[in-house]
Amino acid sequence: MLIQAFRANGFEADTGEVLKDDIDLFSGKLRMAINQGYGLIVTTGGVGAEDKDHSVEAILRLDHSAAAPYIVKFKRGEGRHRKDGIRIGVGQVGSALLVALPGPNDEVSLCIETLVKGVRAGWSKDVLASMLAKLLRGRLLEKMGHHPAHHCQKHS
């Protein structure tokens, strides 16, 4: 779905491999893609609050000032939550833009139009991350049965 959307919008796009939940492997593969000259690297999945989720942390290893806004916050240590929330990540390493999105197809689909628009317009990583996070927060509230205009908390 992502590959087709990028190609339909004039981008050259390749499918990457499915990676194990290992932060060293993940950040190494991102670095390899950067070194191979990819200008936009989008990952899906691995943005949750469990120990196995490392996508955002891998981007932060490569870009210490990456934008990593929360979609939702949790109390760390409750249930499966080993982190304090679910975040997405948008980083910049040289000319490569790195984006970590959630894995569910409906959430990826929701982000495609904004992602393409932001890349084309040259939005900063902070603006792009903020716009994507806003969309995803709204979707989460919809899934929970809340109307976003009445219950949305701003996270930074």
Per-region residue spans from a language model:
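Non-catalytic beta/alpha edge segments that cap or flank active sites
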Residues: M1-S156
